[in-house]
Amino acid sequence: MNQKQLEQMKTSKGFIAALDQSGGSTPKALAAYGIPEDSYNNEDEMFDLVHEMRTRIITSKAFDSDSIIGAILFEQTMDREIEGMYTGDYLAEKKGIVPFLKVDKGLAEETNGVQLMKPIDNLDETLRRANERNIFGTKMRSVIKQANPKAIKEVVDQQFDIGKKIIAAGLVPIIEPEVDIHSPEKEKCEDLLKAEIINHLNQLSEDENVMLKLTIPTKKNLYKELIDHPRVVRVVALSGGYSTDVANEKLKENNGLIASFSRALSQDLNADQSDEDFNLALEKAVKSIYDASV
């Protein structure tokens, strides 16, 4: 593990850019960027276009380590190049930004008010390649919709079981049990989730460290205990469907919680913008998310 990057993740000011839309969510991301589905004929063309979009974001002067500590990539992006370098190397070496890899394979069907992760095939192989590509950590997401204690325990058990394999491979896992912002029991879900996470954190050894990616809680500073826990490198927040402005306002109410937004970062970007307009729009988004994170 890169100790300099670990220190950067623990202490640097800023946020984590989530650039990890996968196959399922790519058409939506491209459409929001002004590239409709009829612009490409197959998946290969679609992934080429989304890599062009990500390259434009990552190479922009607005995308820098003064504001952005880390970036989460989709597996395809990790295997592609920017200006002749693998994306993770470009981020780390040219930009001073810590690269992460999304490793989950999507969500299982909802049962008992939660969605566990689908089985992650070839995890060992993916982690081996991530190490080769100088990736620092990983991210994987599950979703909680109802305050079912047994089901929430299952979600957290699954996250930490896989998280330990990731730690054993020398990477830092971002554990993301998202609470649905539309859940009528959101606050109760968050209380149950916090207790379950603390239980797992307390069982980790001194050299087992994780990051957490959580929905911004209804109760202000609910996650302070997690932020201060010695086994936690950093706690980041997902925007969860809130608009940028709403997410930023909610984030400001929670000390020590920083952003890891995707939609909020790219919502005002468009394929047809001139480089000047594109950079200005990205700079504005970066500044607003940074300000809410510090």
Curated annotation (Swiss-Prot):
The active site is at residues 176, 213. Keywords: Glycolysis, Lyase, Schiff base. The keyword Lyase applies. It is an enzyme of class 4 (lyase). InterPro entries: Aldolase_TIM (IPR013785), FBA_I (IPR000741), FBA_I_Gram+-type (IPR023014). It holds the Pfam family Glycolytic. Transmembrane segments: none annotated. GO terms for molecular function: fructose-bisphosphate aldolase activity. It catalyses: beta-D-fructose 1,6-bisphosphate = D-glyceraldehyde 3-phosphate + dihydroxyacetone phosphate. Pathway: Carbohydrate degradation; glycolysis; D-glyceraldehyde 3-phosphate and glycerone phosphate from D-glucose: step 4/4. Signal peptide: none annotated. Its EC number is 4.1.2.13. GO terms for biological process: glycolytic process. PANTHER family: FRUCTOSE-BISPHOSPHATE ALDOLASE (PTHR11627). Belongs to the class I fructose-bisphosphate aldolase family. HAMAP family: FBP_aldolase_1 (MF_00729). This is Fructose-bisphosphate aldolase class 1. The gene is fda.
